[in-house]
From Swiss-Prot:
Disulfide bonds: none annotated. GO terms for cellular component: cell outer membrane; cell surface. Residues 1-20 form the signal peptide. This is Transferrin-binding protein B. The gene is tbpB. It is a lipid-anchor. InterPro entries: OMP/PagP_b-brl, TbpB_B_D, TbpB_C-lobe, TbpB_C-lobe_sf, TbpB_N-lobe, TbpB_N-lobe_sf. A lipid is attached at C21 (S-diacylglycerol cysteine). Residues 26-92, 384-412 are annotated as: Disordered. Pfam families: TbpB_A, TbpB_B_D, TbpB_C. It comes from Moraxella catarrhalis (Branhamella catarrhalis). Belongs to the TbpB family. Moraxella acquires iron by extracting it from serum transferrin (TF) in its human host. Acts as a transferrin receptor and is required for transferrin utilization. Its main location: membrane. The lineage of its organism: Bacteria, Pseudomonadati, Pseudomonadota, Gammaproteobacteria, Moraxellales.
Length: 706
């Protein structure tokens, strides 16, 4: 990846950016151990200096070497980070890499040469995540824009030449001052045709030729999931969607579209029970081979599986799909159903994918298993296999469900508490691509936080709006603090020995992916993480910018509440680290872009209390005092500027007496990694007089004995 230095954040006079990087001695970052206590404020000790550049490893504490806790001669305690287990993840094959979703376009045979065309893993499309839309509206499905574009291409190919030339001349005339290239001209012609009344009429006529698995017309095609879209999206129009060219020699016929799953809101909490039931549906598409009437049991038309891939829709003529056709007293499933049992204690997922076959004469419904699902849970994702239930040789001419997908299945839990799941698989012989989705049958009794991932808006420039200033926005994450997930854009946050680690992702060349889906991130992404000698393994935090929209962010893997590496329930601990924030006040402001500032916390696990302060280099009084109460593997509390009752925090030490007052901002925090060796949190504040977005991260300390 090409690394480009981040542009220094330009802050208006009304803003304060506090980049807190604890553990530094003056302007030079110290060795990570040992580190003096950042508080250092004794009752009778000397105030001392704020940590000069030659005071190695003294992070600007309020007392010098003689500032003890009760006597000027009491040496100040020194600390070092408690060793942290390496956060090493299992290597994952490309077919099982996590994503917000995946899809594959319906396969076609070239009718000129009629060569068998197996499915190809390389043609699986990484999707960007289900789009959140206004209440009462539907999220656009993957392949819907792709279908429109293919229809548009077919329409333009059949347009009268004189009509196309007229559009061309008009666009050229409108751009005389700055002539367009042929590529630019072609794109403008395409968009002009797209907006034309004539093409919109064609689009309207296509509505009754579009089929998707959540159209709500039958029980089989009603998928009432909130966080996941999945299934097929297909359109069939012989007039405009049949492609025939001489260069290259190509002839495709049949529907266009694809099969997919697409999720939003990756789970941050999961149930703790050993048997949570999920139910839903599944869908599939097959390869193509030069053989008519290929699957006798799956044949919407004889071309399915021959000219184009057969899909789950092609088996509907043999299934119970509609409630009006159910036998008397029937209370079973419809269409292609899926069922899963999840043991969250043992981190196992098992299930089955079924075809609910209906005898057209007796009306009897037979629930026929097509695949057994077996997977292991990793964070909020699962990986495993789909094993075909019917591998008999003579079944290959009846249906395509005869081959396994061993270690070629992946999926994840969606919804804040894992209310839904979805996944995909590709069989070993590249014959069938399947997707599935399901939701909990009943609400789980108890859940536990497994991770945090969020951004706190700071400020926006140039009409950018990815983040709302001083508002928390949940980010997606696949259970790995070292990977920042922004739709289909994933950035590896690999630590180095550098004081700051910077990462960038350039603006994508296209605003859409191969499924025609609009990308969530259409601008340059810039990330800074902070450590200053501390190698955070399970917690990452810092600055995150998408174009001109700026934020601070935090993500971490929560400590378990049970087991030998759980959050302690006895004893006390010191935590030291860093913080980064953005603060504004009425008529005052100051930029601290390169400040080396300290987050200092005392945790009492037995009494479940949190006491901390966020300090800035060269100042004796804290910027924020924080108190909180522990619950499970997290905590909540309040943050206030020091001396709030006396007029607030004097932001300018030069004597201008301009202050910011923040009282009782709500703080949320968590413990991360084995045995709670890392801890972090955040808060926002938004009033007319003062605003703040702050994140902090710390590591547990052990005292260094003389």
């Amino acid at each position: 990846m090409k690394h480009i230095p981040l542009t220094t954040l330009c802050v208006a006079i009304s803003a304060v950016l506090l980049t807190a990087c604890g553990g530094s001695g003056g302007s030079n970052p110290p060795a990570p151990t040992p580190i003096p206590n950042a508080s250092g404020s004794g009752n009778t000790g000397n105030t001392g200096n704020a940590g000069g550049t030659d005071n190695t490893a003294n992070a600007g504490n309020t007392g010098g070497a003689s500032s003890g806790t009760g006597s000027a001669n009491t040496p100040e305690p020194k600390y070092q980070d408690v060793p942290t287990d390496k956060n090493e993840k299992e290597q994952v094959s490309p077919i099982q890499e996590p994503a917000m979703g995946y899809g594959m376009a319906l396969s076609k045979i070239n009718l000129h040469n009629r060569q068998d065309t197996p499915l190809d893993e390389k043609n699986i499309i990484t999707l960007d995540g289900k789009k959140q839309v206004a209440e009462g509206k539907k999220s656009p499905l993957p392949f819907s824009l792709d279908v429109e574009n293919k229809l548009l291409d077919g329409y333009i190919a059949k347009m009268d030449k004189a009509d196309k030339n007229a559009i061309r001349r008009r666009i050229e005339s409108e751009n005389k001052a700055k002539p367009l290239s042929e590529a630019e001209l072609a794109e403008k012609i395409k968009e002009a045709v797209r907006k034309s009344y004539e093409f919109q009429q064609v689009m309207t006529s296509l509505e009754n030729k579009i089929f998707h698995s959540n159209d709500g017309t039958t029980k089989a095609t009603t998928r009432d999931l909130q966080y996941v879209d999945y299934g097929y999206y297909l359109a069939n129009d012989a007039n405009y969607l049949t492609v025939k060219t001489d260069k290259p020699k190509l002839w495709n016929s049949g529907p266009v579209g694809g099969v997919f799953y697409n999720g939003s809101t990756t789970a941050k909490e999961l149930p703790t029970q050993d048997a949570v039931k999920y139910k839903g549906h599944w869908d599939f598409m097959t390869d193509v081979a030069n053989k008519g009437n290929r699957f006798s049991e799956v044949k919407g038309t004889r071309q399915a599986g021959w000219w184009y891939g057969a899909s789950s829709k092609d088996e509907y003529n043999r299934l119970l799909t509609d409630e009006k056709n159910k036998p008397d007293g029937y209370n079973g499933e419809y269409g292609h159903s899926s069922e899963f049992t999840v043991n969250f204690k043992e981190k196992k997922l098992t299930g089955g994918l079924f075809s609910n076959l209906q005898d057209s004469h007796k009306q009897k419904v037979t629930k026929t298993k097509r695949y057994d699902i077996d997977a292991n849970i990793h964070g909020n994702r699962f990986r495993g296999s789909a094993i075909a239930s019917d591998k008999e040789k003579d079944s290959e001419t009846k249906h395509p469900f005869t081959s396994d997908a061993k270690d070629r299945l992946e999926g994840g839990f969606y919804g804040p508490k894992g209310e839904e799941l979805a996944g995909k698989f590709l069989t070993d012989d590249n014959k069938l691509f399947g997707v599935f989705g399901a939701k909990q049958e009943s609400k789980a009794d108890k859940t536990e936080a497994i991770l945090d991932a969020y951004a706190l808006g700071a400020f926006n420039k140039n009409d950018a709006n990815t983040f709302t200033p001083f508002t928390k926005k949940q980010l997606d994450n696949f259970g790995n603090a070292k990977k920042l997930v922004l739709g289909s854009t994933v950035i590896n946050l690999v630590s180095t020995d550098a004081t700051k680690n910077e990462f960038t992702e350039d603006k994508p060349k296209s605003a859409t992916n191969k499924a025609g889906e609009t990308l969530m991130v259409n601008d340059k992404v810039s990330v800074k993480t902070y450590g200053y000698g501390r190698n955070f393994e399970y917690l990452k935090f810092g600055e995150l910018s998408v174009g001109g929209s700026h934020s601070v962010f935090l993500q971490g893997e929560r400590t378990a509440t049970t087991g030998d590496k759980a959050v302690p329930t006895e004893g006390k601990a010191k935590y030291l680290g860093n913080w980064v924030g953005y603060i504004t006040g009425t008529g005052t402001g100051k930029s601290f872009n390169e400040a080396q500032d300290i987050a200092d916390f005392d945790i009492d696990f037995k009494n479940k209390t949190v006491n901390g302060k966020l300090t800035t280099k060269g100042r004796t009084d804290p910027v924020f005092n924080i108190t909180g109460e522990i619950s499970g593997n997290g905590w909540t509390g309040k943050a206030s500027t020091a001396k709030a009752d006396a007029g607030g925090y004097n932001i300018d030490s030069n004597g201008t007496n301009k202050s910011i007052v923040i009282r009782d901002a709500d703080v949320t925090g968590g413990f991360y990694g084995p045995n709670a060796t890392e801890m972090g949190g955040s808060f926002t504040h938004n009033t007319n007089d003062s605003k703040a977005s702050v994140v902090f991260g710390t590591k547990r300390q052990e005292e260094v004995k003389p």
